[in-house]
Amino acid sequence: NTALTYHGYSSFYLAVSQTDTSLSQGYLDEAVNCMRLALFSAKKSLVPQLQYMLGKAYFYKNTVTSFYYADLALKYLSLAKANGYKANDIPEYMGLSYAALGKPMESISSFTEALLLRESDSLLISIAEQYYKVGQTSAAKQYLYRIKKESSDELLVLRAMGLLGAIYTDEKNFSDAKAEFEEILRKNKNSADAYYGLGVLYEKQGDMVKARSEWRKALKLQVNHSGALSKLSEYAK
């Protein structure tokens, strides 16, 4: 049992260190198989840690494969937590898993718990996105302002600006929305999402010529951009 446990753990850590997705998948499969077998005969005191590691393994499987494992990640992380296992990253992993399952309220609850334990810019953007999904834009904006003002992670700042642009567009605050999207494009001229956002802005203003133009720009940069494809298909009818 000890050999299975350690082999499972080492396979997990090898998986998350890989840059090759197919190699990562293989190591994760090995990790899950070993840990599930180890659970059958594990000492009671070791069960919560195995559940925690198994939950994390399923979480990472959910990110590197086309199949969904977020429900299994939640199952084992919840069991580990209920059985008294202490790890500061459990609430964040649970929040991300709830988000993957389309359960924003549960996700917000877990992210809020995570913030009390360990604050990070990635956590702030995650909770802002979930607040946006449930229509609580005032709460979302507070987190996004903080990221814009304080974060040194340029990619997260651009993500925050994009979400602010979408919120401003929804609020019909078109000048501020346009400013966000244009600032993104000044920093990254290849942002398909920013062109898509500008297209939605022009759509709301009733300028469909400009809207289509922006969506086409988005597709030039990202041929499978779901939002731009959907909009152009909608207006092609």
Language model features: what each stretch is:
Residues 125-138, 142-186:
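Alpha-helical adaptor scaffolds
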Residues 1-2, 45-48, 87-89, 121-123, ...:
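Helix-start (N-cap) detector for alpha-helical repeat units in TPR-like alpha-solenoids
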Residues 38, 79-80, 113-114, 146-150, ...:
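Canonical positions in the second alpha-helix
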Residues 13, 60, 100, 133-134, ...:
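Register position in tetratricopeptide repeats
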Residues 6, 53, 93, 126, ...:
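Canonical tetratricopeptide repeat
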